């Protein structure tokens, strides 16, 4: 049996752009994708902390060091520049793999620069 577990997460990223006319997806600074273990073209779930929207799309590699987090296509209607989002990828693991699995949680500052990378989320803690 396989279970779906959090693989990587970029926590509280700031939306830098929303481009309705692009084909689709989310463009993310490649440094952030690497830190979270998320690949270009990988399916991700997005949560918008400002309005509660939850949706899925796939990633596109953005310029390294740019801090870009741009929602493209129809997803651009679900965010505004300056919104705070959480970007999550998931992995399928067998039960024996779960015990050794540690997700990568990337904490960023207001400019989408890496502040810290952790492998757990303490309960009842504001990060």
Curated annotation (Swiss-Prot):
Is synthesized initially as an inactive proenzyme, which is activated by self-cleavage at a specific serine bond to produce a beta-subunit with a hydroxyl group at its C-terminus and an alpha-subunit with a pyruvoyl group at its N-terminus. GO terms for cellular component: cytosol. Its main location: cytoplasm. Pfam families: Asp_decarbox. GO terms for molecular function: aspartate 1-decarboxylase activity. Pathway: Cofactor biosynthesis; (R)-pantothenate biosynthesis; beta-alanine from L-aspartate: step 1/1. Binds 1 pyruvoyl group covalently per subunit. Its EC number is 4.1.1.11. Its cofactor is pyruvate. It is found in: Cytoplasm. Substrate binds at residues 57, 73-75. The active site is at 25 (schiff-base intermediate with substrate), 58 (proton donor). The modification Pyruvic acid (Ser) is found at residue 25. It catalyses: L-aspartate + H(+) = beta-alanine + CO2. Keywords: Autocatalytic cleavage, Cytoplasm, Decarboxylase, Lyase, Pantothenate biosynthesis, Pyruvate, Schiff base, Zymogen. GO terms for biological process: alanine biosynthetic process; pantothenate biosynthetic process. Catalyzes the pyruvoyl-dependent decarboxylation of aspartate to produce beta-alanine. HAMAP family: PanD. Heterooctamer of four alpha and four beta subunits. This is Aspartate 1-decarboxylase. It comes from Neisseria meningitidis serogroup C / serotype 2a (strain ATCC 700532 / DSM 15464 / FAM18). The lineage of its organism: Bacteria, Pseudomonadati, Pseudomonadota, Betaproteobacteria, Neisseriales.
């Amino acid at each position: 049996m396989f279970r779906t577990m959090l693989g990587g997460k970029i926590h509280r990223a700031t939306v830098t752009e929303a481009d309705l006319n692009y084909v689709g997806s989310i463009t993310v600074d490649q440094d952030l994708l690497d830190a979270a273990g998320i690949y270009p073209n990988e399916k991700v779930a997005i949560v918008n902390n400002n309005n509660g929207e939850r949706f899925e799309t796939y990633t596109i590699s953005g310029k390294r060091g740019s801090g870009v987090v741009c929602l493209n296509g129809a997803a651009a209607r679900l965010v505004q520049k300056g919104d705070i989002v959480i970007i999550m990828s998931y992995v399928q693991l067998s039960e024996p793999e779960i015990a050794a699995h540690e997700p990568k949680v990337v904490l960023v500052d207001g400019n989408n620069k890496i502040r810290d990378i952790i492998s757990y989320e303490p309960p009842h803690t504001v990060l």
